[in-house]
UniProtKB/Swiss-Prot annotation:
Gene3D superfamilies: 3.30.70.330. It comes from Arabidopsis thaliana. It comes from the Eukaryota. Belongs to the RENT3 family. It is found in: Nucleus, Nucleolus; Nucleus; Cytoplasm. Disruption phenotype: Seedling lethal. Reduced ability to degrade mRNAs with premature termination codons (PTC). Increased expression of not only protein-coding transcripts but also many mRNA-like nonprotein-coding RNAs (mlncRNAs), including natural antisense transcript RNAs (nat-RNAs). Dwarf with curly leaves and late flowering. Photoperiod-dependent altered development and stress responses; in long days (16 hours light), altered organ morphologies (e.g. Residues 173-482 are annotated as: Disordered. Residues 9-14 are annotated as: Binds to UPF2. This is Regulator of nonsense transcripts UPF3. Keywords: Cytoplasm, mRNA transport, Nonsense-mediated mRNA decay, Nucleus, Plant defense, RNA-binding, Transport. SUPFAM superfamilies: RNA-binding domain, RBD. Residues 9-219 are annotated as: Necessary for interaction with UPF2. The gene is UPF3. Residues 201-214, 337-348, 370-394 have a biased composition (Basic and acidic residues). Recruits UPF2 at the cytoplasmic side of the nuclear envelope and the subsequent formation of an UPF1-UPF2-UPF3 surveillance complex (including UPF1 bound to release factors at the stalled ribosome) is believed to activate NMD. Binds spliced mRNA upstream of exon-exon junctions. Involved in nonsense-mediated decay (NMD) of mRNAs containing premature stop codons (premature termination codon PTC) by associating with the nuclear exon junction complex (EJC) and serving as link between the EJC core and NMD machinery. Eliminates the production of nonsense-containing RNAs (ncRNAs).
Length: 482
């Protein structure tokens, strides 16, 4: 059975925080200098909040020395510089192990003077410092080295040699001739190859049909045209055809000789307007070249006729206004201004190309002849009942105003039924659409329009009926008034 291990290591606790190892040993050595073999001191930490005491570990050689040390230091009082007292406590250490002293020494200890790396370092330090040359000197040295040294030959791999040989065979004289022949062949093929979009003039068939103004015009052609929705092309005054997506209306009141072309599928139909149905002197349909040459003359004649029609309407209105009394003239001007706002707008608004306006009346171009027949029937009918505002005065005043209103309503009916309004610029408008017209109007016409504009009253204020001081009266309009 083993003997119990003898405890030789003690710990001294509760030492002052400011105590050093030298001060502690000065208290121990006078009496126990030769009795201990190992000492370890752990300094403390002094602070206002947490104060940590110092401690010391001492390992004695014999257990008797432990008893004697405990009898001497246990309860020993230490006083610091501030007068605080600290009572020491001697105990057995929890761990009795003590580090063993190492007797082995490192063989390299004290041999740095013989180390080769250290000796080379000393030589480098002993050499004088050399400044680097300037940049110009360095460039000159490099240029001299590059010029003197021979350039290394480029490395050629077998793959590069094979590619060079292949290019030489392809780009030889025979290869170049083959390439040129191939280029010529492609050019010839592209020249002989037909274009994907053949011209419409070559592919389409043209027919010339003479349009008659009588009631017996065959409606089968108009029905076919309206059902298939063809693209109309109207020739303008310069002889150029309008785009295919625009439509041109067939106008009965247009002057003779104006050519209208209609494209339906692959066939092109040219409509010619004849002056008189029963005229035996009508020339046969001419080819398109002769018709194009006469377009400019016909357009100038149509412009003159349109200008004369507009001037005649304005003069007629002025004469009627002068004959009637001021009250009648004011009512006439108001009614005329309400009914014919399109004529005033024709002279104020800028002109627009005929092809864009004609495109709006695409669906009504086939039924214009029927509408004109209805107008002729309405003119032949007996008297119609009209109303006119009644003012204080003689009975003949309502009659004249009723006549004027009847004329105005005839104009409204003609505009709503598709009658063409001719502007001074020579363009045609249908269905009362007078948004775009020419501004070319003489000084006389502008003054007359200003007079008409002054007498105009707002439609919102009137409410579409007679005012509070007017009375409604039904009058019979004579058939000769039209």
């Amino acid at each position: 059975m083993k003997e119990p291990l003898q405890k030789k290591k003690v710990v001294v606790r509760h030492l002052p925080p400011s105590l050093s190892q030298s001060d502690l040993l000065s208290q121990i050595d006078p009496r126990f200098a030769d009795r201990y073999n190992w000492v370890s001191f752990r300094p403390g930490k002094s602070s206002y909040k947490n104060q940590k005491y110092s401690r010391a570990y001492v390992s004695f050689k014999a257990p008797e020395d432990v008893y004697e040390f405990a009898a001497f230091f246990n309860g020993h009082v230490f006083v610091n510089e501030k007068g605080a007292q600290f009572k020491a406590i001697v105990e057995y250490a929890p761990s009795q192990r003590v580090p063993k002293p190492s007797d082995k020494k490192d063989p390299r200890e004290g041999s740095i003077s013989k180390d080769p790396d250290y000796l080379e370092f000393l030589k480098v330090i002993a050499q004088p410092v050399e400044n680097l040359p300037s940049a110009e000197i360095q460039l000159e040295r490099r240029e001299a080295e590059q010029s003197g040294a021979s350039k290394a030959a480029p490395i050629v791999t077998p793959l590069m040699e094979f590619i060079r040989q292949k290019r030489a065979t392809v780009m030889g004289p025979q290869g170049l001739s083959d390439i040129r022949r191939g280029g010529r062949r492609t050019r010839v093929v592209s020249a002989n190859k037909p274009s994907p979009r053949p011209s419409k003039r070559n592919s389409e068939k043209k027919k010339y049909v003479e349009k008659e103004s009588s009631k017996n015009v065959p409606r089968k052609t108009t029905a076919d045209v309206s059902s298939s929705k063809p693209d109309y092309r109207q020739s303008n005054s310069s002889g150029k055809e309008l785009p295919g997506n625009e439509t041109a209306a067939i106008i009965d009141s247009s002057p003779p000789g104006i050519a209208l072309t209609m494209d339906s599928g692959k066939k092109k139909i040219l409509l010619l307007r004849s002056k008189d149905r029963d005229n035996p002197d009508n020339p046969p349909p001419q080819p398109e070249q002769h018709i194009d040459t006469n377009l400019s003359r016909n357009s100038t004649d149509s412009r003159q006729n349109q200008k004369s029609d507009v001037g005649g309407r304005l003069i007629k209105g002025i004469l009627l206004r002068n004959d009637s009394r001021p009250s009648q003239s004011s009512t006439f001007v108001q009614s005329e201004q309400r009914v014919e706002p399109s004529e005033a707008e024709n002279y104020k608004r800028p002109s627009r190309p005929a092809n864009t306006r004609a495109g709006k009346d695409y669906h009504t171009s086939g039924t214009i002849s029927e509408k004109q027949e209805r107008r002729t029937r309405n003119k032949d009918r007996p008297d119609r009942v009209m109303w006119a505002p009644r003012r204080d005065g003689s009975e003949d005043q309502p009659l004249s105003s009723a006549g004027n209103n009847g004329e105005v309503k005839d104009r409204m009916f003609s505009q709503r039924s598709g009658e063409v309004v001719n502007s001074s610029g020579g363009h045609t408008l249908e269905n009362g659409s007078a948004r775009h017209s020419s501004r070319r109007v003489g000084g006389r016409n502008r003054k007359e329009e200003v007079v008409i504009g002054e007498g105009k009253t707002s439609r919102r204020g009137s409410g579409g009926g007679p005012s509070s001081h007017e009375k409604q009266m039904w009058i019979q309009k004579p058939s000769s008034g039209t």
